[in-house]
């Protein structure tokens, strides 16, 4: 991978702000997309036991945390060229036996959500910046298993 540029970091950061502008709505988009592709994922998230409820603070909090981690990964990539994940994140994903295909489902849902959040500002360059930041975060989480 080449160096993560300042422009890529700015694209991720600005689109994260678009996501944050309506976290309840975009949390629903995100988790609905995950459950459409992988219904069994419902069992991996305790806050999905009653479905996708935008008024559930755990649902919106988890979405904001995940998208924030990807944004932070973009910052780490720009500053250091690598992403380091907290060991606890690796431990949680290891305990739940998260697989590569599950990481892909989350990435696809994340991209769909950001695309909806930014509307006509969506571009291949924006998609690529989020993909790189997410992929590097996922790799760091797996390394911390």
UniProtKB/Swiss-Prot annotation:
Name the record gives this protein: Leghemoglobin 4
Location(s) in or outside the cell: Cytoplasm, Cytosol; Nucleus
Gene: LB4
One annotated GO biological process: nodulation
Residues annotated as binding O2: 62
Family listed: Belongs to the plant globin family.
Entries under SUPFAM superfamilies matching the protein: Globin-like
Domain Globin residues, every copy: 3-145
Induction trigger: Negatively regulated by cobalt (Co) in a dose-dependent manner. Suppressed by exposure to excess nitrogen (N); this repression is associated with nodule greening and reduced biological nitrogen fixation (BN) efficiency.
Keyword field contains Acetylation: yes
PTM sites of type Nitrated tyrosine: 26, 31, 134
PTM note: Nitrated mainly at Tyr-31 and, to a lower extent, at Tyr-26 and Tyr-134, in effective nodules and particularly in hypoxic conditions; this mechanism may play a protective role in the symbiosis by buffering toxic peroxynitrite NO(2)(-). Nitration level decrease during nodule senescence. Phosphorylation at Ser-46 disrupts the molecular environment of its porphyrin ring oxygen binding pocket, thus leading to a reduced oxygen consumption and to the delivery of oxygen O(2) to symbiosomes.
InterPro entries: Globin, Globin-like_sf, Globin/Proto, Leghaemoglobin-like, Leghaemoglobin_Fe_BS
Signal peptide feature range: none
Modified residues (N-acetylglycine): 2
Tissue expression per record: Specifically expressed in root nodules, and barely in pods.
Gene Ontology MF term list: heme binding; metal ion binding; oxygen binding; oxygen carrier activity
Residues binding heme b: 46, 65, 93, 96
Function: Leghemoglobin that reversibly binds oxygen O(2) through a pentacoordinated heme iron. In root nodules, facilitates the diffusion of oxygen to the bacteroids while preventing the bacterial nitrogenase from being inactivated by buffering dioxygen, nitric oxide and carbon monoxide, and promoting the formation of reactive oxygen species (ROS, e.g. H(2)O(2)). This role is essential for symbiotic nitrogen fixation (SNF).
Keywords tagged on the record: Acetylation, Cytoplasm, Heme, Iron, Metal-binding, Nitration, Nitrogen fixation, Nodulation, Nucleus, Oxygen transport, Phosphoprotein, Transport
Superkingdom as given in the UniProt entry: Eukaryota
Quaternary state and interactors: Monomer.
PROSITE patterns associated with the record: GLOBIN, PLANT_GLOBIN
Record-level GO cellular component terms: cytosol; nucleus
């Amino acid at each position: 991978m080449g160096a993560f540029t300042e422009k890529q970091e700015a694209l991720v950061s600005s689109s994260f702000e678009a996501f944050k502008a309506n976290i309840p709505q975009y949390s629903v988009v995100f988790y609905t997309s995950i459950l459409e592709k992988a219904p069994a994922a419902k069992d991996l998230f305790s806050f999905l036991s009653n479905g996708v409820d935008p008024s559930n603070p755990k649902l919106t909090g988890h979405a904001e945390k995940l998208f924030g981690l990807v944004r932070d990964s973009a910052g780490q990539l720009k500053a250091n060229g690598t992403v380091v994940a907290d060991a606890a994140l690796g431990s949680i994903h290891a305990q739940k036996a998260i697989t590569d295909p599950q990481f892909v489902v989350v990435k696809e849902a994340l991209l769909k959500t950001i695309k909806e959040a930014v509307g006509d500002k969506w571009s291949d360059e924006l998609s690529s910046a989020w993909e790189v930041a997410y992929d590097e975060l996922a790799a760091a989480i797996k390394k911390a298993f």
